[in-house]
Amino acid sequence: GRQLPNPEAHWLEAHTRSFNYPDTGRTVQLQDKASLGIKACFLSNSFAAYRLQALMAQGGFPAHLPLGEDTFTAAKLLLSGQSLRYQASAAVYHSHNYNGLQDFQRMFDTGVFHAQNPWLLQNFGKAEGEGAKLVKSQWAYLKAQASQPHHPNFLQGIVQLLSANVMKLMGYKLGRVHQWLPKALVKKFAMNKVFWQPKQ
C-alpha cells in the first residue's frame, strides 16, 4: 500500500514519501528490475499483505536482519517467479521526522543489510543510483516549493537537503564496511541496537 506523510512531517520526509509511494499503482515482476533496479523489490514493511503460501515457500520472514525484512522477502518472491502489487488506492499515514543522527543510523543499518546480503545487489543493482534520483527529485521539489507558504526558504532548504543526505550517505557507506569497524563503534552507529546483542 501507499504511505502518506503525517501532517507534521518535515518537507524532506514528506517529499520522500511521495517519491517512494507515487499515486499510481503498478504490478512488478522480475523482468522489471531492468528498468527499476533495486526499486523493483521495494516494499512497505508497515503496510503490506502477503499470500501465506508464497511467503512460507520462501521460509517466511528472515529472523536475523538489522532491517529490510520487507525488501529481503520481496526480492525472494520476485526471484521465485511471484509478482508484487503496489496498490496506491490503499493508503496509511506513516512517516518519521528523523534528525541527522537518526538518518545516519538508519542508513548505517541499511548498509549493514546490503553488506550481509550481497545477493540482493547482485540481482537488483546498487542502491546508490536510487539515492541519487531521490536527491535530484528533492532538489527539483525545493526549487519549485521554496517560495510557497509553510516551506523553508531556499538557502535553509539547501542546508537541510545537503546535511540530511550527507549524513545518510556517510551512514550507508560505513554500514557497507561495518566488518572493519570496532564493535563498540558499530553499536553506536546502529539504530537497531538489539541486532548486535549476543545471540542466545
Regions found by a protein language model. Name each.
Residues G1-A14:
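Conserved donor NDP-sugar-binding/catalytic core segment of glycosyltransferases
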Residues G1-R2, R17-A40:
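Short, flexible, basic/aromatic active-site loop/helix in glycosyltransferases
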Residues S44-G59:
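Conserved nucleotide-sugar donor-binding
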Residues Q53, F72, A91:
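Active-site phosphate/pyrophosphate-handling residues
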Residues L67-T73:
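Acidic donor-binding loop at a coil-to-helix junction in glycosyltransferase catalytic cores
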Residues T73-K76, Q82:
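Short active-site alpha-helical segment characteristic of glycosyltransferases
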Residues L84, A91-K168:
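Active-site-adjacent helix/loop segment of glycosyltransferases
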Residues L161-Q200:
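Juxtamembrane C-terminal module of membrane proteins
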